[in-house]
Amino acid sequence: MHWMEVTEESSVLTSFYNAEDESNLLLPKLPALPKNYSTTAKIFSEEKSDEIMKLLGDVRLNALVLGGSSGFIEIYAYGMFKIATVTGVAGSCRGLCLSSDLKSLSVITEIQDSSGSEAEITYFQLDTSLLSSYLPEVTRMARKFTHISTLLQYIKLSLTCMCEAWEEILMQMDSRLTKFVQEKNTTTSVQDEFMQLLLWGKASLELQALLMNQLTVKGLKKLGQSIESSYSSIQKLVISHLQSGSEALLYHLSELKGMALWKQKYESLGLDASGIEEAITAVGSFILKANELLQVIDSSMKNFKAFFRWLYVAMLRMSEDHVLPELNKVMTQKDITFVADFLTEHFNEAPELYNRKGKYFNVERVGQYLKDEDEDLVSPPNTEGNQWFNFLKNSTHLKESPLLFPYYPEKSLHFVKRQMERVIDQCLQKPADVIGKSVHQAVSMSLYKTSQSEDSTPQLFKLPFLWNDKTSNIHYVLFTILENSISKIYILRRHTDTSRSVSNGILAVEFGNFLNNSINESSDSRCYSCLDAHFYDDETVTVVLKESVEQEGKERVLAQLPLSSVYTDEDQDKELIWDSTKRLDEQSGEISTRTVFLENQWRVLENMKAQYVSVNGIRKVSCVLSSNLRHVRVFEMDVEDDGEVEEEEEEETTQIAAGEPDELNQSADNQDNVCGASAEELPDETEEHESSLDP
């Protein structure tokens, strides 16, 4: 995994970065999702909305690069939407580095012919010049993709909130009304009994007992208020969230279509106007279905309110309680119609639902739109007699008109949403395929074979290490090759522009003596192997070293290696003539070697068998990990030395207490040797942590 940010500057890019996004002027701000629903919706809550807007306002392109097995590599713009899929790179990916000018991608892979054989580490440089050549266009397209991806997530979470609002009343409906229907023992239908109560004002003794003992007046009132509140919440979510999100999605897709029609700029990137038009049509169908749901909610609310008001008054009269004057009034014909419609819709026999919701209680009209199922609506809207539908059926020209969005009267809102997501994904997948196919292999170098002893070490900590010098536009690769029991550090560098070359493309670095003579042996006989190396910044490499002869009292060293001591102005060394039929370790004798003396830029790592290092030059921090992966030390680098402060937290485990040789002992006399370094160059261990890293 690798994250990069474009740093290239040009007049075209500067004008693009400074240009204001018109969507901020033309589109209303998306309302925040309610916090009382799903926790996943909190990303669009009031507290998080500013962070989302900040992300969408970041015009400078940054990308997340992911690599997997079988040479599968993906590039995600802003870490959200895929803009390139690269295939065909041999081996399993172990390292990635996309140059900040987008001209090339460095890849380290591990190729293993069979399960028992040694793996071969190979370096590839992939040409990604299409991204670099069309950087303004890629950036604008990626911004649109990010907007569209964010809006799809916003719509999905809005629908999730609607479903949760509906589930609140669905549980109450099931536990009360369905139970009431199932326990009915009379031969007449529930619908007939309620109709008798509606028309004659009298209920059967059984219906009266069930209403008064199970449902109760108080329970009915509470149920009615809960249902009305949930209806209002769903209605508000449709109007303020689904519709606003869909309209914004339609706007950005329309802009994307306009970009696709500018073939000179965007055709090479794979934007397809016809595919985007299909996506626009799918969004239109979703908007139509959302509007249909609004009409159903409005109709159902009227029926529900009328039914519960009527039943509430009827139950008050059954219990001989006082009926308020505003409730004790003659029902109008419209009220009777609403109640009759409710009874017809919800207490009508539906044999296909016997095993799902109760034998005589039909699925609620609003809830069927929110079900994430492929089945058709149980109660689709009645379009008979609708003049517009009749006009469309009789018009041969309008039936296939691209100006009209398709309408799916038999499908739920969830179904239409999934169809919209599928069409949009297909539409936006093509650029990733086209850009991925444009990426081709420019360089392939077999470096070395891994030793069997390294198999148990997590690959996360293993060299090689990749780095991109954003100023000089150079790719670096750090790795070690064991030669005569000493691990030299090799520095491979290549220009990000695959058509250009750099001097000293491959060099080996060995470390001469730099420790004080007071450490046991003579300085002339001491050699150091490189255990791990990471770039601290563009000019410095942080390394972990050990003496080649492992003995008790031989300490590991954390040091800073300036590249200026490796690449000097008077370099006239002969360049390696690469033999592509051999691995690099088979040609190591022909590689120029630099012997480096680090002077004051080092520190002895006392009482720790250090093996791995990770650094951050921006934060000026280095982190050292022990060889058994159990102990960590954190160092502050390049700080003023106001007096060394050390905080040690000794981990007391049974293994260490038993004398496990994970940590080396250092005499107190040797501690003074650390203090001879420069105050600005010496790593200052201001904080040290030793903790167990076992899972």
What residue spans do the PLM features occupy?
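Residue-level signature of beta-propeller blades and closely related beta-rich strand-turn architectures
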Residues: 70, 79, 111, 547-549
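Loop/turn segments within WD40 beta-propeller blades
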Residues: 54-61, 98-102, 536-538, 615-618
